[in-house]
From Swiss-Prot:
Gene3D superfamilies: 1.10.287.310. GO terms for biological process: translation. InterPro entries: Ribosomal_uL29, Ribosomal_uL29_sf. NCBIfam families: L29 (TIGR00012). One of its GO terms (molecular function) is structural constituent of ribosome. Keywords: Ribonucleoprotein, Ribosomal protein. This is Large ribosomal subunit protein uL29. It comes from the Bacteria. GO terms for cellular component: ribonucleoprotein complex; ribosome. The lineage of its organism: Bacteria, Pseudomonadati, Spirochaetota, Spirochaetia, Spirochaetales. Belongs to the universal ribosomal protein uL29 family. Signal peptide: none annotated. Disulfide bonds: none annotated.
Length: 72
């Protein structure tokens, strides 16, 4: 799923996606320690995907606060 696909997900779907990516990232880190991994760049790719999801989550949080008239 590209970054554009994340923008259309709901807040709960984004949280679920982040948990899924974090689980994959931890599994990959374990595999890197225990055995050989074919695509070592996958670790960087997963970190960037997690960062993108976090960005969309924060944007949705700020948008919701703005709708309520709350300022940080």
């Amino acid at each position: 799923m590209g970054r554009g696909g994340c923008a259309q997900l709901s807040y709960s779907e984004l949280l679920s996606r982040r948990r899924e990516l974090e689980r994959k990232y931890l599994d990959l880190r374990f595999q890197l320690v225990v055995e050989h991994v074919d695509n070592k760049l996958m670790k960087r790719i997963l970190r960037r995907q997690i960062a993108a999801v976090n960005t969309f989550l924060r944007h949705k949080e700020l948008t919701e606060l703005e709708k309520r008239g709350v300022r940080e």
